[in-house]
Amino acid sequence: VDKDTVNHWLPLLGCHCQEVMNYFFRNLHLEECQLDELWTFIYKKEKQLTALEKLAEVYGDAWVWIAFSPVCKLVPAWVVGKRTLSHARRLVFRLKSASDGQIPFFTSDELPHYADALLEVYGEQVQPLRNGTRGRFPKPYRVPPPDLCYAVVVKKREQGRVVEVSTRLVYGTTQQVEAALQASPVSHAINTYGVERNNLTIRQHSRRMSRKVNAFSKD
């Protein structure tokens, strides 16, 4: 099959798959959700881009943001883009749109974008009172709702190898985390194992996502 033919049909197939996903992935009941991102590149790596190619924001480093449900082995939301807060926010917003409104127990790595995105999408706005009767009201801010529970897995690396793994609670209470883990049929501790295993499956089955191989697909 000619490469131009493949390039013609792939966008059409992708749009159709997205429509099918949007149709079926509604009102999903998610008890637990793991967030992560996969690195790859388009055409060439970021450090090899020219100034003009960087302005286009099409080539170079690309990240596949994934929200993964370890209970039902489902990816209810994903985003392709740069490693920015706006793309993290888009991922969480798509996840919320696909769910039934219940906030799942979130876990991820220590990337700070997730905490900010969760607060922006699920947070409740608070309007502070002003002092006195004159002047503008203070700028409103967002606070995490009582049922938002989010913990991160922190990996310490030395010379590229993981030497220590710890966890940290960002939103919620220790009691909420313990209750979520007791209710989970798959997780017995704060982890991102499910989404990391899913990432490995993606890399093994797609040459576009393969790393450190002599058959990387970039054309």
Show the residue positions of the predicted features.
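Residue-level recognition of single "structural anchor" positions
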Residues: V1-D219
